């Protein structure tokens, strides 16, 4: 089944790359309007639609010039590969640090990108929660309910989706909290993924499968995606906050080589820096992401469960180590899910 998903993801990726390359998506138009392109991961589209408007307004009032921001969304890993393969974009706002390191390793992003902006270039965070249908018919209360018989789980493919990698590590954090041996932890994860019935290439695809197509009993989801679904379909879904999850830290970076060629280095930096402004941080909270500004985060204490025990990626040795251990070819995910 996963081969079909990989074929679909590859086809969509090819179409996206061609469309962006053919549009000539960055630089300065004849009327003086500056255009930059932001390649992002799946569930951020609604946030960046709003953010781009407030940034465009800010930029024009600050500089007296118009700016147009083009945005592209898909599975984070697939998006990163599209940039490496030639998509001419100025900034990336991806699901995990490893995806930006992939672009850095190609030479397109300068070393040290993670220190260019505050909080390790992560202007917002999130976590992973469980979304169930109204009434919670399968009585899901924590991760251990996802390994029971007759529970159909929806989650995307870690081979193409950064969010899926966070999902995997959130579940593994529960296993590590409750089981001492690696054998027990792997057994738990194997049982969970045996219950996964559909594995889409990205987080938004999995939401569509669960919500619009009515597949599955529980969706492993970004917290912001679950909150958006609750707002869009009032009375139809419930969020189950697990006892243990992971602190998900999406990362942002300038694609330095492209931005220099396009003459957009300064505006690209300003675009990402403005994510830390009070106005943007407020919008981040309203959009279901957790602001890095603690004072603004506290305004949303009724929206987010701040009592979930959150593991950090550092507990796994950082993203490079975690990716090798769990998501590379032949790593734990392949061991438990099969080829």
Predicted features along the sequence, with ranges:
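Extracellular/periplasmic juxtamembrane helices and adjacent flexible linkers that interface
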Residues: 259-339
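C-terminal motif of bacterial Sec signal peptides marking the signal peptidase cleavage site
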Residues: 20-24
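Structural recognition of the beta-strand scaffold that forms the well-ordered cores
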Residues: 37-40, 70-72, 91-94, 122, ...
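A conserved helix-loop-strand patch within extracytoplasmic ligand-binding domains
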Residues: 104-176
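Early extracytoplasmic/lumenal segment of secretory-pathway proteins
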Residues: 25-106, 116-117, 222
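Extracytoplasmic
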Residues: 31-33, 64-66, 78, 86-88, ...
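Ligand-binding pocket segment of bilobal, Venus flytrap-like solute-binding proteins
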Residues: 178-243
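Bacterial N-terminal signal peptides that target proteins for export
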Residues: 1-12
């Amino acid at each position: 089944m996963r081969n079909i998903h990989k074929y679909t993801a590859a086809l969509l990726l090819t179409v996206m790359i061609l469309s962006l390359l053919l549009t000539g998506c960055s630089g300065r138009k004849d009327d003086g309007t500056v255009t930059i392109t932001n390649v992002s991961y799946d569930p951020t589209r609604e946030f960046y639609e709003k953010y781009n408007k407030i940034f465009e307004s800010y930029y024009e009032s600050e500089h007296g010039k118009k700016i147009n921001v083009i945005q592209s969304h898909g599975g984070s890993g697939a998006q990163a590969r599209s940039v490496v393969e030639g998509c001419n974009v100025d900034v990336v706002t991806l699901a995990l640090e490893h995806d930006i390191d992939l672009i850095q390793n190609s030479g397109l992003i300068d070393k040290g990108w993670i220190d260019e902006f505050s909080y390790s270039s992560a202007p917002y965070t999130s976590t992973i929660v469980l979304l169930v249908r109204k009434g919670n018919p399968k009585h899901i209360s924590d991760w251990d309910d996802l390994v029971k018989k007759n529970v159909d789980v929806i989650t995307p493919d870690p081979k193409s989706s950064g969010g899926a990698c966070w999902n995997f590590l959130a579940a593994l954090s529960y296993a590590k909290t409750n089981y001492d041996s690696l054998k027990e932890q792997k057994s738990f994860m194997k049982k969970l993924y045996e219950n996964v019935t559909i594995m889409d290439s990205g987080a938004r695809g999995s939401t569509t499968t669960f919500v619009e197509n009515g597949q599955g009993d529980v969706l492993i989801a970004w917290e912001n995606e679950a909150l958006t679904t609750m707002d869009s379909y009032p009375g139809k879904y419930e969020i189950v906050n697990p006892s243990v999850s992971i602190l998900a830290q999406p990362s942002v970076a300038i694609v330095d080589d492209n931005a220099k060629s396009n003459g957009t280095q300064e505006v690209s930096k300003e675009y990402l820096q403005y994510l830390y402004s009070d106005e943007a941080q407020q919008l981040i909270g309203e959009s279901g992401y957790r602001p890095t500004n603690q004072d603004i985060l506290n305004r949303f204490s009724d929206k987010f469960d701040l009592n979930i025990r959150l593991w950090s990626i550092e507990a796994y040795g950082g993203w490079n180590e975690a990716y090798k251990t769990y998501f590379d070819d032949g790593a734990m995910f392949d061991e438990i899910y099969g080829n």
